[in-house]
Curated annotation (Swiss-Prot):
<keyword id="KW-0967">Endosome</keyword>
<protein>
    <recommendedName>
        <fullName>Vesicle-associated membrane protein 8</fullName>
    </recommendedName>
</protein>
<dbReference type="GO" id="GO:0046718">
    <property type="term" value="P:symbiont entry into host cell"/>
</dbReference>
<dbReference type="GO" id="GO:0015031">
    <property type="term" value="P:protein transport"/>
</dbReference>
<dbReference type="GO" id="GO:0070254">
    <property type="term" value="P:mucus secretion"/>
</dbReference>
<keyword id="KW-0968">Cytoplasmic vesicle</keyword>
<dbReference type="GO" id="GO:0005765">
    <property type="term" value="C:lysosomal membrane"/>
</dbReference>
<keyword id="KW-0072">Autophagy</keyword>
<keyword id="KW-0051">Antiviral defense</keyword>
<dbReference type="Pfam" id="PF00957">
    <property type="entry name" value="Synaptobrevin"/>
</dbReference>
<dbReference type="GO" id="GO:0097352">
    <property type="term" value="P:autophagosome maturation"/>
</dbReference>
<dbReference type="InterPro" id="IPR001388">
    <property type="entry name" value="Synaptobrevin-like"/>
</dbReference>
<keyword id="KW-0175">Coiled coil</keyword>
<comment type="similarity">
    <text>Belongs to the synaptobrevin family.</text>
</comment>
<dbReference type="GO" id="GO:1903595">
    <property type="term" value="P:positive regulation of histamine secretion by mast cell"/>
</dbReference>
<dbReference type="GO" id="GO:0055037">
    <property type="term" value="C:recycling endosome"/>
</dbReference>
<feature type="modified residue" description="Phosphothreonine">
    <location>
        <position position="27"/>
    </location>
</feature>
Length: 100
């Protein structure tokens, strides 16, 4: 009788060890899931920050592009006016409207 009772104790001990092992594995899995959730939250926050930064960069770059476009337009107009004045003087000298 004691031999069979001793085997039962081993079986119960083995089952408890297995249950403890499964419990440890489940605890690790829950910790990993929580860490993953925290990592996802951190990643989402970084993504939102990056999105806001990219919007700011987009508007700033558009303003800079517009500023340089106007600067180029002003330079082209200035060059055209200078060329027109030079051509006007050449024509006026050639026609004799301005005495030499």
């Amino acid at each position: 009788m004691e031999a069979s009772g001793g085997g039962g104790d081993d079986r119960v001990r083995n089952l408890r060890d297995e249950v403890e092992g499964v419990k440890n594995i489940m605890t690790q899995n829950v910790e990993r899931i929580l860490a993953r959730g925290e990592n996802l939250d951190h990643l989402r926050n970084k993504t939102e920050d990056l999105e806001a930064t990219s919007e700011h960069f987009k508007t700033t770059s558009q303003k800079v592009a517009r500023k340089f476009w106007w600067k180029n337009v002003k330079m082209i107009v200035l060059i055209c006016v200078i060329v027109f004045i030079i051509i006007l003087f050449i024509v006026l000298f050639a026609t004799g409207a301005i005495p030499t």
